[in-house]
A protein has these predicted regions:
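Gly/Pro-rich interdomain helix-loop hinge
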Residues: 235-263, 267, 276
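Glycine-rich phosphate/pyrophosphate-binding beta-alpha loops
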Residues: 106, 211-244
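Carboxylate- and glycine-rich phosphate/diphosphate-binding segment that chelates Mg2+/Mn2+
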Residues: 114-220
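ATP/NTP phosphate-donor binding region
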Residues: 1-54
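Buried hydrophobic packing segments
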Residues: 43, 66-70, 164-165, 188-191, ...
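Short, well-ordered alpha-helices that flank and scaffold nucleotide-derived cofactor binding pockets
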Residues: 16, 45, 72, 76, ...
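Glycine/threonine-rich beta-strand-loop-alpha-helix active-site module
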Residues: 38-140
């Protein structure tokens, strides 16, 4: 997790319950946005020293991704160099059990097969794709997301919307992923503004919408927005959702001109009143 979630009492909602049933726990709260190789190493050391049986990831995409990397390396120590996990990871053993508790409605890291780490020396991000890293349990509870400031709700919400749009328009899309992405766009487009304004029902809808988008794009991948957003995050430390928000309109216009399904996409979304 990160220091902010500890200081504002979000982590205590979990650890207090663990105390009630007599579970022993330790904590690593050094995660920062765009987690680095160094952060993964620090978290791994804390986990190994604790002797714990499983990991709990509390936070947005950065704590989730950090926890995934720690879990994978713990059971596959031959990949202690995180860089060796880039791309399609050749691990043989499942991750240490991970319980994911997202506190933002955006990344869907709790259901995807990938995680993103920043190489602080080379100032680049790299994506690790590994079916072994999916958390065993995900607690998607809108109550854990209530404390997000409006700016974070907006940024993470656009990340979720970008997942849905890119998953829908990617060349690998097919009938099942189209169904997931269209539904995700419908949910997110109808809830994002009200969620930022603080409406409870909209917050619950965003929690669902980002999850559905994650189930979709985890099967087909993403596109140019994320391809360009990752370098922005690595080089300028731009928050991921903000980078997506900057790039998404431009990539959508590019895709509309150069991809064969743009009219089909637009017609479908207009019929569902997702766009005007």
């Amino acid at each position: 997790t990160d220091k902010t979630l500890v200081q504002c009492g979000v982590v205590a909602k979990v650890t207090d319950k663990m105390d009630e049933v007599g579970l022993v726990w330790d904590i690593y709260s050094g995660v920062l946005p765009n987690p680095t190789i160094g952060i993964v190493k620090e978290g791994l050391e804390v986990f190994q020293h604790s002797g714990a049986d499983y990991l709990i990831a509390i936070g947005g995409g950065s704590p989730q991704d950090t926890c995934k990397a720690i879990g994978i390396i713990s059971n596959n120590p031959e990949f202690a160099d995180v860089r060796s996990l880039e791309g399609l990871s050749p691990t043989r053993k499942p991750s240490v059990p991970v319980l994911a508790i997202p506190t933002t409605a955006g990344t869907a890291a709790e259901v995807t097969i990938n995680y993103v780490i920043t190489d602080e020396e080379k100032r680049r991000k790299f994506v690790c794709v590994d079916p072994h890293d999916i958390p065993q349990v995900a607690f998607i509870d809108a109550d854990m997301m209530d404390g997000m400031p409006p700016s974070l709700k907006a940024a993470t919400g656009v990340d979720a919307l970008t997942h849905a749009i890119e998953g829908y328009t990617t060349r690998g899309a097919w009938a099942l992923t189209d169904a997931l992405h269209i539904k995700a766009i419908e949910i997110i487009a109808g809830a994002l503004r009200d969620s930022v304004a603080g409406e409870r029902d909209a917050g619950e809808a965003m929690a669902l919408g980002q999850y559905v988008a994650g189930m979709g794009f985890s099967n087909v991948g993403l596109g140019l927005v994320h391809g360009m957003a990752h370098p922005l995050g690595a080089f300028y430390n731009t928050p991921h959702g903000v980078a997506n928000a900057i790039l998404l309109p431009h990539v959508m216009r590019y895709n509309a001109e150069y991809t064969g399904r743009s009219e089909e996409h637009t017609s479908e979304l207009q019929s569902r009143q997702c766009i005007s």
